[in-house]
Amino acid sequence: MADQSFTLFIILAIAGYIAVKWFLSNNEQHPSIQINGFSSQSDSATASGTAASSNAASRQTRRRIRRRVNDDMIEVVQSLAPHLHPEQIRYDLEQTGSVETTVERYLSGRDMPFPPDYVPESETGGNSSNGQNQSTGSSVTTGNNTNNNSTSTDPRKRSNIKADNLLKKFNVDPQEDLSNLNPNDLSIEERKRLMVWQARKSMELKVENSEYLQSLLK
């Protein structure tokens, strides 16, 4: 009797072990578990891709950001530098974001380039006129004159107004001390005068510290 009970216990233990193993094996291969695992992996990959795309887009946006420029800013700079083309002023203001900085760059002799994609209207007209003159064969001289006219009207070839002319225009004495003036207490004309004086002083300081600039003034 004892042998039969022991044998029955062994059989039940083996059967229970097999049943548990079979149950666990089925759970691992169950389609719902596989789908859930795949979904979580897919969601994780999608989130990573979205984050990477967002970072790349934000970096690209930062590179393309240009400071906003309105007509009032351009008008103020052009009143101080009337020989500058509005597109030159706009392009520089987009980089500096400051009227004062742009004026200082101009008065200190910095080059004020046009936007890379800018094409003056006179240049297109000059090229077409040159083609017509050459096709008639009657006028190499006329073609040259047209070229010279288009060059003189091309705003990129105009000589910039000198800083000394601005001193006269706004009645600014370089020897006068305006450092104690508060721009907030001044009128628009007085602010322009102060800006010219500040730019002149800044330029003088740069010339004093640069042998290259000193050589250009000799």
UniProtKB/Swiss-Prot annotation:
**Cytoplasmic compartment segments:** 26-218
Low complexity bias spans: 39-59, 121-153
Q: For this UniProt entry, what's an example GO CC term?
A: endoplasmic reticulum membrane
Q: Which InterPro entries match?
A: CUE, Cue1_U7BR
Annotated transmembrane regions: 5-25
One Pfam family this sequence matches: CUE
Q: Which residues form the CUE domain?
A: 69-111
* Described function: Component of the endoplasmic reticulum-associated protein degradation (ERAD) pathway. Recruits the soluble ubiquitin-conjugating enzyme UBC7 to the cytoplasmic face of the endoplasmic reticulum membrane where it functions in degradation of misfolded or regulated proteins localized in the endoplasmic reticulum (ER) lumen or membrane via the ubiquitin-proteasome system.
Q: How does it assemble?
A: Forms a heterodimer with UBC7.
Q: What name does UniProt use for this protein?
A: Coupling of ubiquitin conjugation to ER degradation protein 1
Species the sequence originates in:
Kluyveromyces lactis (strain ATCC 8585 / CBS 2359 / DSM 70799 / NBRC 1267 / NRRL Y-1140 / WM37) (Yeast)
Its gene? CUE1
